[in-house]
A protein has these predicted regions:
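Short alpha-helix boundary/capping segments
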Residues: 78-81, 120-124, 230-233
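Gly/Ser-rich oxyanion-binding loop with an adjacent helix/lid
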Residues: 3-4, 95, 99-199
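Charged/polar, low-hydrophobicity segments characteristic of intrinsically disordered regions
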Residues: 88-92, 162-174, 240-243, 248
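Short beta-strand scaffold segments in enzyme catalytic cores
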Residues: 27-30, 54-58, 163-166, 170-173, ...
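Short amphipathic alpha-helical segments
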Residues: 78-85, 125, 148, 285, ...
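ATP-binding N-lobe of GHMP and related small-molecule kinases
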Residues: 1-117, 131-145
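C-terminal nucleotide
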Residues: 1-27, 33-37, 194-332
Length: 332
């Protein structure tokens, strides 16, 4: 599919309410660096985080004035920073939704996890909003479910690249790669049918090291890759790791899975350390948690591993079959 496939001129005048819960996700092969128009420099693979989600409600009404209006609240309260971002996003995608020019939108979003703390809140929030808009459009179109999923991912990407991976799951790929025939830079695809069953209910526990906002936004982090001296090598490694991870996910080989995902996590943080200006995303307790994971794995031979997002928090990954012992370790 190409961009023109997602342009819709059809419109209508009606009132209604749509609601959507959309999960966050954690990348295994990381997306870090982009071209124009939210096109990734390399493919990425992620697990969806079903228990970390954004709830978004969109009420639409025929516009009251010549210019349509967009009203946004976060958890029921006005938030001018978020409202500006949402307004800019919706205005940037109006050519893909014919109904937008005829309607005022009243949007409320809320997360069940800390915002801007390294859990991908932009992924869940943008994908939830995109899903609501496509659901509104579906009232006047005859597009099938597969097309609607693609469009939801496509629109999500324009708001936040990683959001494209939050539409489906539990295992999702975004970015063109020879390793997957259906892959695209424009939207993410669900690859769960190509992975071993052990990864369908793989566990993720998030250690909140610091609930505050990230040191640097993901957008600025991507921008810094444009002049990072190691960027080209990084993109090459990520492309190779995507192909390698495809085979690992299919075979269910956990030791190799751990090797790639932990390497990817540390590489992203090392890239930020080598950027100009540089940023230290970890906190002392982040490193302490990582050391404890490595020690636990050496002692028990269980498959507890870690990955990181662009923040201080640690995502612990482990198979469901090992939950009982690993949960005791985490709780202590």
């Amino acid at each position: 599919m190409i961009e023109q496939d997602f342009i819709c001129y059809d419109s209508f005048e009606s009132s209604g309410i749509v609601e959507w819960n959309s999960p966050s996700n954690i990348a295994l092969v990381k997306y870090w660096g982009k071209k124009q128009n939210q096109i990734p420099q390399n493919p990425s693979i992620s697990f969806t985080l079903s228990k970390c989600y954004t709830n978004t409600v969109v009420e639409f009404k025929p516009k009251k004035n010549t210019q349509n209006e967009i009203y946004f609240t976060f958890d029921g309260k006005e938030n001018q920073d978020f409202e500006k971002k949402v307004n800019a996003f919706i205005k940037s995608i109006d050519k893909y939704f014919g109904f937008l020019k005829n309607h005022d939108l009243y949007i409320n979003s809320k997360n069940n996890f800390p915002h801007s703390s390294g859990i991908a809140s932009s992924a869940s929030s943008m994908s939830a909003l995109a899903s609501c808009l496509v659901d509104i459009e579906s009232q006047i179109t005859s597009n099938d479910n597969n097309f609607n999923l693609r469009k939801k991912s496509f629109i999500s990407r324009l708001g936040s690249g990683s959001a494209s991976r939050s539409i489906e799951g539990p295992v999702t790929l975004w970015g063109k790669t020879n390793a997957y025939k259906e892959s695209s830079d424009l939207y993410a695809v669900n690859i769960s049918h190509e992975v071993d069953k052990i990864f369908h209910d793989y566990n993720n526990t998030i250690l909140i090291i610091d609930p505050g906002q990230k040191v640097i936004s993901s957008s600025l982090g991507h921008e810094l890759m444009n002049k990072n001296p190691f960027s080209n090598k990084r993109f090459e490694i990520a492309k190779n790791n995507t192909a390698r991870l495809k085979n690992i996910l299919k075979s269910g080989e956990l030791d190799d899975f751990i090797s790639i995902t932990e390497s990817e996590a540390l590489m992203i943080h090392s890239l930020m350390l080598s950027s100009d200006p540089y940023y230290i995303l970890m906190k002392p307790n982040t490193l302490e948690a990582i050391y404890k994971v490595l020690e636990f794995r050496r002692e028990t031979k269980l498959h507890l591993s870690f990955t990181l997002d662009a923040g201080t928090n640690v995502h612990l990954l482990y198979p469901k079959s090992e939950t009982e012992i690993i949960k005791k370790f985490i709780d202590n």
